[in-house]
Amino acid sequence: MITLKEALSKPKGELQEIKDELKKRAQEQSEINAYVALDESGEGVPVAIKDNIQVDGWEVTCASKILKGYIAPYDATVIQKLRANGLAPFGRTNMDEFAMGSTTETSCYGKTLNPKDTSRVPGGSSGGSAAAVAAGIAIAALGSDTGGSIRQPAAFCGVVGMKPTYGRVSRYGLAAYGSSLDQIGPMTQNVEDAAILYNIIAGSDAKDSTSARIECKPVVPDPKRKLKIGVVPNYVKDASGAIQKAYDKAIEALKQEGHEIIEISLMDAKYDIASYYITAMAEASTNLSRYDGVRYGYRAEAKNLKEMYLKTRSEGFGEEVKRRILLGTFVLSSGYYDAYYIKAQKARHIIKDEYNKVFEKVDLILSPVAPDVAFEFGAMKTPLEMYLSDVYTIGVNLAGLPAISLPVDEHEGLPVGLQLIGKAFDEQTVFDGAMSLENALK
């Protein structure tokens, strides 16, 4: 598959040929279900778009029945930036409904399969974007990351996935799940392409009140820069043998490149999980209250307004979304607000402070992305099992840090990805370390 860097140098005529070839390949591999629609919009290098990012004139549904028929009346800021830089939206990728999930199984369009092994999950919630890039039916894609939704599917499918610092990329036009956690980012074939796409979409935006009003310099990855990289033995001991082997391999590769490896420790990640899910579900319960059948999307037949609200939301939302709305409403209720929500925010501040202290000693942290390689469909028996599998990714979102997942090893034909975590607004160092590691593993 042609890389993003190569595609950007092609004339218009060749780009149309590339689009036609991508469409043909996608139709031939339709059983993967990476795309929910092969829409096109404008001229330029084709970039696949997750189904929760607004593209003017496209049906954008967040993979939910409740938004079926909704046509986006505007472009998200990231889409405007793509168009301004010679790229064009191409294809809506599948996802977990409203980005709530880790397997891309909760979509109203059916599950997406992992191109590396179709009996296994592609990860989620940006599983369609990861699968499309891995299957060679997308040059690059945009995803969103609330608690690992770019990095985990990237690791499961063997591609590069980058979550920028919170506030670095505009959220204007991204359907909100957890407003203090969500961030749009690139999913690509290699680190260089991720840096190119990141440079295009990053920057302050007056239309997004959570956008950081600080200078955003383009990153130019420097693989020769020597860095202090923190490793976390107490984190890795609970991961599978395949993850531990890949972790050791990455450490050796980084040492060979001249980086200084420093052992660090982080607080027990069980606090990350509790703080994250209370925060994310509370924010989801308020953000999703707007989907009521009145203004847009699905509307159930009903005799009165109250019945319409009840039936629309009961029929329109899937089981996982309803579960999270209920839990979020519970932790925000008057009797439990202090006991759960306020306590979660205090824990979040402690988690952020801990990362800040660690970054006084190191430039980057090397961490697993998931406890194991991509698992088989049906392997996770309960929602709690699924939530616990996010243990390595959610702390990054709670602290608002940048991180990049890249393939490091293989286990029985399945990709093993690890992540490099950086200081807030220091994407340059994240890309420096990632390109150095990628080069060392070639």
Swiss-Prot record:
UniProt-recorded Gene Ontology molecular function terms: ATP binding; glutaminyl-tRNA synthase (glutamine-hydrolyzing) activity
Kindly state which keywords UniProt assigns to this record, in alphabetical order: ATP-binding, Ligase, Nucleotide-binding, Protein biosynthesis
Q: Which reactions fall under this protein's catalytic activity?
A: L-glutamyl-tRNA(Gln) + L-glutamine + ATP + H2O = L-glutaminyl-tRNA(Gln) + L-glutamate + ADP + phosphate + H(+)
**GO BP term (any one):** translation
Q: State the EC number(s).
A: 6.3.5.7
What job does the chain carry out? Allows the formation of correctly charged Gln-tRNA(Gln) through the transamidation of misacylated Glu-tRNA(Gln) in organisms which lack glutaminyl-tRNA synthetase. The reaction takes place in the presence of glutamine and ATP through an activated gamma-phospho-Glu-tRNA(Gln).
Question: Member of which family?
Answer: Belongs to the amidase family. GatA subfamily.
Q: What is this protein called?
A: Glutamyl-tRNA(Gln) amidotransferase subunit A
Organism annotation = Nitratiruptor sp. (strain SB155-2)
